[in-house]
Curated annotation (Swiss-Prot):
GO annotation (BP), single: nuclear polyadenylation-dependent antisense transcript catabolic process
Alphabetized GO MF terms: mRNA binding
Sorted UniProt keywords: mRNA transport, Nucleus, RNA-binding, Transport
Name by which UniProt lists this protein: mRNA export protein mlo3
Subunit structure: Interacts with rpn15/dss1, mex67 and uap56.
PANTHER family: RNA AND EXPORT FACTOR BINDING PROTEIN, RNA ANNEALING PROTEIN YRA1
Record localization: Nucleus
Species for this entry: Schizosaccharomyces pombe (strain 972 / ATCC 24843) (Fission yeast)
GO cellular component: chromosome, centromeric region; euchromatin; nucleus; transcription export complex
Function: Has a role in the mRNA export process. Interferes with mitotic chromosome segregation when overexpressed.
Length: 199
């Protein structure tokens, strides 16, 4: 350090290599490529797959003193995991005895119906279980059950419609002419030849 301080400014500059002024590269606004970029998840498709795996039932005619926790405990232990359990309440805040249960698995709603439909509660009340189906899945299943029309039948129906149209148009173009008797035809022939002889 002492030796460098003793040197003059000219000596320090002369000792450094002559490289001239270094130009800095212009920064580009392009984003740098990121490694291992994860593809974006399609939220709609993910949500649709989750919804299609659910199953839902409505249980009615329950005692009014039954709580949501009791309903959930019953179905979780006997059927399977539940996503949501809710009770319907009246304007006075009292339970109507109607519970909505959404299961995590698609087949649990059918199992709950088979196991608890018509079962007695407190020895007097009959439980009523209804399976709530997704309307979009109902439409899809109905469309799948309808068989597509074959090409042969479709072309035959089209050709039949065209031929019927042609027949109707031909019938309209040709009016019904009255048929002439043999006497009328002979008379016309005599008149024709008689006029030719006069000429």
């Amino acid at each position: 350090m002492s030796m460098e301080l003793d040197q003059s400014l000219d000596a320090i500059i002369a000792s450094k290599p002559k490289g001239g002024i270094r130009k800095r590269r212009a920064r580009s606004n392009k984003p740098k490529p990121t490694k291992n970029a994860k593809p974006a998840v399609n939220t709609a498709s993910a949500l649709k797959s989750v919804i299609s795996e659910e199953s839902k039932i409505i249980v009615s005619n329950l005692p009014t003193d039954v709580t949501e926790a009791q309903v959930k405990e019953l179905f979780v232990k006997s059927i399977g995991p539940c996503k949501r359990v809710s009770l319907a309440y009246g304007p006075n805040g009292r339970s109507k005895g109607i519970a909505t249960i959404i299961f995590s698995r698609p087949g649990d709603a059918t199992r709950a119906y088979e196991q608890y439909e018509g079962r007695l509660v407190d020895g007097t009340r009959k439980m009523k279980v209804e399976i709530i189906l997704d309307p979009s899945r109902q439409l899809n299943s109905l469309a799948a059950r309808v068989s597509p029309a074959s090409n042969a039948s479709a072309t035959a129906s089209k050709n039949g419609a065209k031929s019927s149209k042609r027949k109707t148009t031909r019938r309209r173009r040709t009016p019904n002419r009255p048929k002439k008797s043999a006497e009328e035809l002979d008379k016309e022939m005599d008149d024709y030849f008689g006029s030719n002889e006069k000429e």
